[in-house]
Amino acid sequence: MAKKIVAVIKLALQAGKANPAPPVGPALGQHGVNIMAFCKEYNAKTQDKAGFVIPVEISVFEDRSFTFITKTPPAAVLITKAAGIDKGSGESSKGSVGNISKAQLEEIAKTKLPDLNCSSVESAMKVIEGTARNMGVSITD
């Protein structure tokens, strides 16, 4: 018989830099999970993606064991890195804070495709383009 899931915890952590300090410690500690075991596994799995924030979904079972799934970095983070800016515009309708090319947009869309509710790269590009537009980043040919 399959183990029963008692909690699903969603966190966004720096790749390769998870430690028992908040937010990891309190979130996992209240469910009785071995925090250091999670930190070691997460850091090993994400060390090649250093510099990115990687969302993770942790399933905690009734025997206090756990499994986790890492997601792709948020689209906003990928867009700001591609555009070379610190953050998006507070008022996206008033002007552009940066540019990304169609090729960069396609690369981001291919990266995000597994986590998006899209079946093709073209539809994923439209989703990412909308995110970029809302951040005040323009798309150039």
From Swiss-Prot:
Pfam families: Ribosomal_L11 (PF00298), Ribosomal_L11_N (PF03946)
InterPro entries the record matches: Ribosomal_uL11, Ribosomal_uL11_bac-typ, Ribosomal_uL11_C, Ribosomal_uL11_C_sf, Ribosomal_uL11_CS, Ribosomal_uL11_N, Ribosomal_uL11_N_sf
Residues spanning the membrane: none
Presence of the UniProt keyword rRNA-binding in the record: yes
Mod. after translation: One or more lysine residues are methylated.
GO cellular component: cytosolic large ribosomal subunit
Regions annotated as coiled coil: none
Gene3D superfamilies: Ribosomal protein L11, C-terminal domain, Ribosomal protein L11/L12, N-terminal domain
Keywords, sorted A to Z: Methylation, Ribonucleoprotein, Ribosomal protein, RNA-binding, rRNA-binding
Molecular function terms, GO-annotated: large ribosomal subunit rRNA binding; structural constituent of ribosome
GO biological process, one term: translation
Subunit structure: Part of the ribosomal stalk of the 50S ribosomal subunit. Interacts with L10 and the large rRNA to form the base of the stalk. L10 forms an elongated spine to which L12 dimers bind in a sequential fashion forming a multimeric L10(L12)X complex.
Similarity-based family: Belongs to the universal ribosomal protein uL11 family.
Known role: Forms part of the ribosomal stalk which helps the ribosome interact with GTP-bound translation factors.
NCBIfam families in UniProt: L11_bact
HAMAP family assigned: Ribosomal_uL11
Protein name: Large ribosomal subunit protein uL11
Gene: rplK
